[in-house]
Structure formats: structure tokens, C-alpha cells
Curated annotation (Swiss-Prot):
The gene is holE. It catalyses: DNA(n) + a 2'-deoxyribonucleoside 5'-triphosphate = DNA(n+1) + diphosphate. DNA polymerase III is a complex, multichain enzyme responsible for most of the replicative synthesis in bacteria. This DNA polymerase also exhibits 3' to 5' exonuclease activity. GO terms for molecular function: DNA binding; DNA-directed DNA polymerase activity. The keyword Lipid metabolism does not apply. GO terms for cellular component: cytosol; DNA polymerase III complex; DNA polymerase III, core complex; replisome. This is DNA polymerase III subunit theta. It is an enzyme of class 2 (transferase). Transmembrane segments: none annotated. GO terms for biological process: DNA-templated DNA replication; lagging strand elongation; leading strand elongation. It holds the Pfam family DNA_pol3_theta.
């Protein structure tokens, strides 16, 4: 199913953006990269914070089944 995200209404676009933020937090947690989920949650709109928590739980559960690649931070 292909969908043009630019044609979504603003409320759906906000939900997509919040879901993307939750996926980013779960990704960083999976690779033991520094991230503070509460700080990212506070950056989300007030009415979508519960959606952020739901999506974060879903992404965390999905990442249990995924393999890990070694994370090597950039050396300066």
C-alpha cells in the first residue's frame, strides 16, 4: 500500500512525526546510544504524548526480534 504522506491532514501528519520520534528513541536504545526518552517525549505536543508512549512500547517490543549490529561511536 503506497500512500503519499504529503496528502495527509495535519493531525495524521503529527501522529506520523510522533511515531518517527518514538522509532528513533527505540533505535538508539537498541544500539546503546545515548538518548533520554523522557526528554524526547516532552518535545512532543501535549495531546500526542500518550500516542508517543504507545508507539515507543510497540517499537521496543518489535526490536526484541531484530538483530543488532555493533555500534562504534565516531572517534575524534
Amino acid at each position: 500500500m503506497l500512500k503519499n504522506l504529503a496528502k495527509l491532514d495535519q493531525t495524521e501528519m503529527d501522529k506520523v512525526n510522533v511515531d518517527l520520534a518514538a522509532a528513533g528513541v527505540a533505535f538508539k536504545e537498541r544500539y546503546n546510544m545515548p538518548v533520554i526518552a523522557e526528554a524526547v517525549e516532552r518535545e512532543q505536543p501535549e495531546h500526542l504524548r500518550s500516542w508517543f508512549r504507545e508507539r515507543l512500547i510497540a517499537h521496543r517490543l518489535a526490536s526484541v526480534n531484530l538483530s543488532r549490529l555493533p555500534y562504534e561511536p565516531k572517534l575524534k
